[in-house]
Swiss-Prot record:
Source organism of the structure: Influenza A virus (strain A/Chicken/Victoria/1/1985 H7N7)
Protein name (database record): Protein PB1-F2
Main function: Plays an important role in promoting lung pathology in both primary viral infection and secondary bacterial infection. Promotes alteration of mitochondrial morphology, dissipation of mitochondrial membrane potential, and cell death. Alternatively, inhibits the production of interferon in the infected cell at the level of host mitochondrial antiviral signaling MAVS. Its level of expression differs greatly depending on which cell type is infected, in a manner that is independent of the levels of expression of other viral proteins. Monocytic cells are more affected than epithelial cells.
InterPro entries tied to this protein: Flu_proapoptotic_PB1-F2
Subunit structure and binding partners: Oligomer. Interacts with human SLC25A6/ANT3 and VDAC1. Interacts with host MAVS.
Subcellular location: Host mitochondrion inner membrane; Host nucleus; Host cytoplasm, Host cytosol
Gene it is expressed from: PB1
One Pfam family in the UniProt entry: PB1-F2
Length: 90
């Protein structure tokens, strides 16, 4: 009988429950997440990815050579307005 291969999806959607026995050995049991846990997991992963994307964007933007205080202020205000608008929509 073939063993099912773990894919990134199954690895990310299954929770490994590790229990210690009385003799100190560890046992692992895979638990399939319910829909609420799966939704929470998805939101957490997407939030982390979005934060990483924003961080990379800001690092790239701040590394520009001709950065002036005025251009920085203008850019930050535009990004803040866009971010605030998205927060109200969500």
């Amino acid at each position: 009988m073939e063993q099912e291969q773990d894919t990134p999806w199954t690895q990310s959607t299954e929770h490994i429950n590790i229990q210690k026995k009385g003799n100190g050995q560890q046992t692992q049991r895979l638990e399939h997440l319910n829909s609420t846990q799966l939704t929470d997991h998805y939101l957490k992963i997407m939030s982390q990815a979005d934060m990483h994307r924003q961080t990379v964007y800001w690092k790239q933007w701040l590394s520009l050579k001709n950065l002036t205080q005025g251009s920085l202020k203008t850019h930050v205000l535009k990004r803040w307005k866009l971010f605030s608008r998205q927060e109200w929509i969500n």
